[in-house]
């Protein structure tokens, strides 16, 4: 019988999982249906589909990890299973962060106007550049995830065959290396989003000064596009600022022993990021927003028709 804290944890994690998978699944479904209808897919749709799929995987892994910790705490005594879970979790987490940074770079190249030859070349080659970044993000996530976790497990296994002193040294070094690699892997996408934000802000300030000189008004389409992109990147950065410290605590478990309560709180907080950001993406995309509002109207009408008549 779970305790009160464990029951609250189960309710929260199940609710977050349902909301997150539904939101990200909605993004995948709408874009795939549109893809089949038009027989074509846009670059932004590819980014959103990739991001949503990676987050669905991340949500499932985090939730599965939480239920193992809570209901089957002895599961991770099987080192192979722990290594597999670590690898899948690391891959889903890193791919989610990298795909989000790819979305920020897309906003930057699509909207910003910066008078530099290299930036101008990137804008001309935006499709190839973004697709290359997407593929690179996928490969980087694979490199960071599976080989590192596999090597760590191998060294951890070797450490148990020696004396206690040697075991501590061997198991701690790969654990520290793993933690450092995970942290750097999450930090690079954050820095790319931060750079995109400042370049978008610089482009907006410059554009605002230009339209003030020509007295054309401040709410032109380019300004609106700048503002929407900046808001999207700011929201992501704020969510990541909340997510990243918890991520550091969760990845330090190989060096610092953690209690069940800390791990449960960590799971709850880390699930908030991929769950909530999906709805921000839906409301920030005209096609997704229209489909979402249409679905809400359908559900509202269905519930109204199903409402029983009073006496």
UniProtKB/Swiss-Prot annotation:
Transmembrane residue ranges: 10-32, 53-72, 87-109, 129-146, 180-202, 234-256, 261-283
One cellular component term from this protein's GO annotations in UniProt: plasma membrane
Membrane listed as a keyword: yes
Entry membrane topology: Multi-pass membrane protein
Principal location: membrane
Keywords: G-protein coupled receptor, Glycoprotein, Membrane, Receptor, Sensory transduction, Taste, Transducer, Transmembrane, Transmembrane helix
Pfam families documented for this protein: TAS2R (PF05296)
Cellular localization per UniProt: Membrane
Protein family according to the UniProt entry: Belongs to the G-protein coupled receptor T2R family.
Protein name: Taste receptor type 2 member 9
Species this protein is from: Papio hamadryas
């Amino acid at each position: 019988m779970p305790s009160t804290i464990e029951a609250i944890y189960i309710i929260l994690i199940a609710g977050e999982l349902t909301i997150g998978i539904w939101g990200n699944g909605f993004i995948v479904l709408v874009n795939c249906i549109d893809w089949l209808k038009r027989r074509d897919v846009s670059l932004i749709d590819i980014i959103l589909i990739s991001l949503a799929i990676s987050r669905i995987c991340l949500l499932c892994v985090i939730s599965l990890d939480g239920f193992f910790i809570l209901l089957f705490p002895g599961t991770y005594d099987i080192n192979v299973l722990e290594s597999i879970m670590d690898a899948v979790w690391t891959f889903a987490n890193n791919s989610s962060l990298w795909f989000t940074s790819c979305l920020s770079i897309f906003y930057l190249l699509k909207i910003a106007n910066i008078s530099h030859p290299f930036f101008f070349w990137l804008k001309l080659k935006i499709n190839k550049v973004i697709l290359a970044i997407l593929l690179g993000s996928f490969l980087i996530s694979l490199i960071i995830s599976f080989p590192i976790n596999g090597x760590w497990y191998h060294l951890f296994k070797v450490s148990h065959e020696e004396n206690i002193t040697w075991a501590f040294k061997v198991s701690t070094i790969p654990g520290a290396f793993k933690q450092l690699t995970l942290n750097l892997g999450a930090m690079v996408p954050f820095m790319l989003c931060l750079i995109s934000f400042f370049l978008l802000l610089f482009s907006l300030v410059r554009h605002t000064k230009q339209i003030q000189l020509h007295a054309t008004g401040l709410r032109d389409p380019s300004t609106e596009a700048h503002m929407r992109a900046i808001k999207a990147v700011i929201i992501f950065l704020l969510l990541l600022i909340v997510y990243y410290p918890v991520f550091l605590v969760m990845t330090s478990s190989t060096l610092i022993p953690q209690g069940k309560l800390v791990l449960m709180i960590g799971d709850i907080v880390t699930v908030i990021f991929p769950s909530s950001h999906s709805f921000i993406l839906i409301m920030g995309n005209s096609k997704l927003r229209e489909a979402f509002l249409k679905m809400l109207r359908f559900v509202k009408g269905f519930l109204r028709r199903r409402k029983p008549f009073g006496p």
